[in-house]
Amino acid sequence: MATVNQLVRKPRAPKVDKTNVPALAACPQKRGVCTRVYTTTPKKPNSALRKVARVRLTNGFEVTSYIGGEGHNLQEHSVILIRGGRVKDLPGVRYHTVRGALDCAGVSERRQGRSKYGAKRPKS
């Protein structure tokens, strides 16, 4: 335990918590422009072609963002919104694309969990 004199000389350093989404800079979402849209393969033991986009954000960061849902309309120069949330089987992918916002269309024919994919309520 430190003495009072020691604490006067050198106060206790506050704990620094590390963020998992540094590019968001404490914002809930960030806007960016797609610089490359491509597919990549997941780690073992999974197998698929996962859709991802390389995005240049408004704050200058360049990050990789996962595009969830079946099918998408993104291409180079599309303006998208990203949020935090990593993809466990894709190393280096720490962000998700927000479907149904800006240039990214929602998932068509989506019936359940629609709010996560920007799909409107279907006409019954």
UniProtKB/Swiss-Prot annotation:
Quaternary context: Part of the 30S ribosomal subunit. Contacts proteins S8 and S17. May interact with IF1 in the 30S initiation complex.
Family designation: Belongs to the universal ribosomal protein uS12 family.
Residue intervals passing through the bilayer: none
Keyword hit for Nuclease: no
Domain of life, source organism: Bacteria
Function per UniProt: With S4 and S5 plays an important role in translational accuracy. Interacts with and stabilizes bases of the 16S rRNA that are involved in tRNA selection in the A site and with the mRNA backbone. Located at the interface of the 30S and 50S subunits, it traverses the body of the 30S subunit contacting proteins on the other side and probably holding the rRNA structure together. The combined cluster of proteins S8, S12 and S17 appears to hold together the shoulder and platform of the 30S subunit.
Molecular functions (GO terms): rRNA binding; structural constituent of ribosome; tRNA binding
One Gene Ontology cellular component: small ribosomal subunit
Any Pfam family hit: Ribosom_S12_S23
Keyword terms: Methylation, Ribonucleoprotein, Ribosomal protein, RNA-binding, rRNA-binding, tRNA-binding
3-methylthioaspartic acid: residues carrying this PTM: 89
Coiled-coil segments: none
Protein name as catalogued: Small ribosomal subunit protein uS12
GO BP, sorted A to Z: translation
